[in-house]
Amino acid sequence: RDSFYTKLRELQETKAGKVRIAYFGDSMNDGDYIVQDVRSEFQENYGGEGVGYVAVSSLSAGARGSISHQYSKNWFSQSFIKVKKPMKPFGIDGQVFFAKDPAQAYWVRYKAQSQKHSTLLNNPVLLYGRGNNSKAYVTVAADKDSVSNKSLNPVNLLNTLSLSSHNAKSIQVNFHNADSIPIYGL
């Protein structure tokens, strides 16, 4: 297998392909304090755009400079720090979120900021898990000018749903009848 550095060198020399980097850590990651600078340097030198994965909710959401992140406060969440046997598998950040009460409104809103390489939400995709719910759907508002309903099909351990056909500046996702489905983020 090729090493990480070999892949970076190939990318630098050929200007073709992608190297995806996941960096795990604590609230300094979640708040994007250090990571935004490292990510920006990698993107400047090797290409790429965007901020990467952002969970449904975050204690550091208000502190992020790379993306404006808001969400309804009624999400039920489980974290590997507090729960040893979650209702559904944790996501890549060690959390899982549920819209438990179908009578309530659950939503997330993301807006790209003006930092270099992070001015758009590139190919926004919802990550969600398996559930026994065939009635769930989301209403997606991309850049406030296009609104669409999209069904959730929670058949796999991890499912993806493309939220916009273009790179959007902002996106709001409203969840409907999604009560048994684990939601992870974008």
What feature does the model see in each segment?
Residues 1-24, 28-185:
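N-terminal secretory targeting modules
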